[in-house]
């Protein structure tokens, strides 16, 4: 499942969301995936438990988090949700706080997680200007167009 197709089909984009804590921000993304029948509600708690155990493992770059759990923690099918925050939040990451872009990922297996999920997100942000372009998006279509332009350039 491609990032763009998942976001469009699942209507799992939320822009300029308001959240008080990093946990609230993660829940917004997971709730979009629950609504799209991509994950079970327990996926949220699995992510929180993993952070408690391993720290903020999914904060990948300055301003960017990719919350995800394991396939057996409630994933029904592979999918993505994209959330931008109105106000950046601290995730307690030493180098990459604060975060205002979250791409929540659910993968049916570890191979999909590595090869499909992470690679598509790396591709999107290979051009660092895409961070600011994404922050400037105000509609779902603007996000999809940005991904299309990035894919066309790749």
Curated annotation (Swiss-Prot):
The modification Phosphohistidine is found at residue 68. Keywords: Cytoplasm, Kinase, Phosphoprotein, Phosphotransferase system, Transferase, Transport. The gene is ulaC. Induction: Induced by L-ascorbate. Repressed by UlaR. InterPro entries: Ascorbate-PTS_EIIA_comp, PTrfase/Anion_transptr, PTS_EIIA_type-2_dom. GO terms for molecular function: kinase activity. GO terms for cellular component: cytoplasm. The active site is at 68 (tele-phosphohistidine intermediate). SUPFAM superfamilies: Phoshotransferase/anion transport protein. GO terms for biological process: phosphoenolpyruvate-dependent sugar phosphotransferase system. The phosphoenolpyruvate-dependent sugar phosphotransferase system (sugar PTS), a major carbohydrate active transport system, catalyzes the phosphorylation of incoming sugar substrates concomitantly with their translocation across the cell membrane. The enzyme II UlaABC PTS system is involved in ascorbate transport. Its main location: cytoplasm. This is Ascorbate-specific PTS system EIIA component. Residues 6-150 form the PTS EIIA type-2 domain. The PTS EIIA type-2 domain is phosphorylated by phospho-HPr on a histidyl residue. Then, it transfers the phosphoryl group to the PTS EIIB type-2 domain. The keyword S-adenosyl-L-methionine does not apply. It comes from the Bacteria. The keyword Transport applies. It is found in: Cytoplasm.
